[in-house]
Amino acid sequence: MWTKALLASALLGLGLSAQDTLRLNFPADSPVAVISSNWGESRAAARGGALVVDLRTTLKLKNTSRLRLRGISLQVAVQELAAGGKASVSVPSLDVYPGQEFPVKIDLRLLQPNASAGAAVVQVQLDGVLFEDLSFFGPNRLGSRRQLIAWELEARRDRHHLKQVLAKGGEDSLRQSMLEILAQDTARPKLDVRLARAPASFPNERQIEVAFMRQTDFPVEATGGVVMASGNELRIPSLSFENRDKREVRSVELGLIIRDAEGREFSAGSLPAPLSMKPNGTGTVQPTASLQLNRGQGLPLRIESISGFVQQVEFTNGDVWVPPTSFRHEARLLKLVPGSVEEQRLSDIYRRRGMAVLLEELNKQ
């Protein structure tokens, strides 16, 4: 059975009324408890025949388990079946002790199709919680288990690397590494990537063969793929992979690098895909999404060529694999692909609070 914490507040001047409702639905045996919640600075406004809800609030939760909590994922919805009616909030890189309270910030825009209903009803459900031993609790409807574990493995990898830098070269070497991370993040070319359902074809589209980076010691290798491109849009009819591992594969995530007509390269994010592959077997996926790519200020980008690399693998036994530091630090990727959530968090700590606080943070876990 699910317990329902029903919280409502009238916020005059914020566009919300007493009829607007914020519902938090957590399982009765949830290892996370709701301490407090309200609408915060949220707003709701009718636009056409729909109700637009700008949900801006912070939930206060508590770890009621006996393990340290590493990440949490929530599903937030006003209308699950409508476009724009559902979203998710995930918070990785946590270190919440048993009994400790922690905030989860929500900043989302949701669309409730029927404004005539007269009230905004926002449902917040727990999709999953990850603990220090990589155990997971939750329905996992959004596939958050895979992503939370991947984020945690990347965090451990990057923390280990920075600790090695500190051990070998002291604070000066660590400081230099953090300055390089900050400089790379500033210099990294940015690309706006928008996903949509792939059409059967684009007008005047052309075929481009995907060039895959060599990953000889990885558990899964991308072996073939083509994209159909038209201007700044692309769709991917098929991608082929080979499983080199003894474990059965459940899903693969492919990182994409785009080169434009002027020879500039950009990271286009990653493309996760469910893919069942037996040990030492092969498989093909046919992604259903298309990508629209724009540079800064909405300027379209003309796609010239595409490179790909395996960024994540999930196995049917629950294991998740992420690339090692040596591959992450390959010059081309370092220049183009943003660092992990944990690397960004630690570099922000160094930038805002200095070396002493960074050292304290590295020694925590």
Regions found by a protein language model. Name each.
Residues P113-D133, R295-N317:
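Short, surface-exposed ligand- or partner-binding patches at beta-edge/loop junctions that are enriched
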